[in-house]
Amino acid sequence: SLGYEMAYSNVLNMLDLAGLPLRSADRPELTPLIVAGGTCAYNPEPLAPFVDLFVVGEGEEVTLEYIQLYRQAREECWSKEEFLQEAAQIPGIYVPAFYEPVYREDGTLEEMRIREGSGAPEKVRKRVVENMDGAYFPVKTIIPSTEIVHDRVMLELFRGCIRGCRFCQAGYVYRPVRSRSPELLAQYGKAACEDSGYQEMTLSSLSSTDYPCLLELCDDLLDYCAPRDIGLSLPS
């Protein structure tokens, strides 16, 4: 998951520590498959030589689609090339091996040429989860054996942001704004605390105080959290 550009070198370090060839072209087998997503996947070319496919946009739905395709590829003994050709047909999937960037003398991009015979689409459109209430939420999570930074239940109130700050990458790529209902969020938060044993719950979004039902949700969650000594917080 590529959250910011300074993490690119970490990706290469991870591949090196795993004993894997860095470049996708030097990994001819279907397994392992290197997949990248996150906000930086909207500008995939810096890591294009090293990643097999990028997920452009939101991953809840498209991840299930390419995993199902990957299972089929394993069962039917597809080659890596065959799998990537089929994966490229899934909306939101960008396979860099099927495209060749052409640059001008000043280093700016002139065009993207599609590799002949690849069947890759001319444009890759980002995936957007239309209905946040219907999107998957990880009520049951894997609890780490060591202390981690975000050692709490994270409730995503809504996706996107109404502010449009010019410096904020996430505020633009996660448009349009889509909210979860307060009833469902309260249900998720309580269930996640019961399952994990976490003693803190965070109401997380790009601008959480813009959530229209914030007071209603906080009242509901405080009635649950206070008797159980569970903290309820907003991100900074």
Model-derived segments and their meaning:
Residues 1-3, 11, 52, 93, ...:
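Conserved structural-core and active-site-/substrate-pathway-adjacent residues in large, well-folded domains
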Residues 1-114:
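Glycine-rich beta-alpha loop elements in corrinoid/cobalamin-binding modules
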Residues 5-8, 41-44, 62-64, 101-103, ...:
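Flexible loop/turn segments at secondary-structure boundaries
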Residues 6, 190-236:
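Conserved SAM/AdoMet-binding glycine-rich loop
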Residues 33-34, 53-54, 92, 152-154, ...:
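Beta-sheet entry/capping signal
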Residues 34-37, 41-44, 63, 153-161, ...:
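Structured alpha-helical segments in the cores of large, soluble enzyme domains
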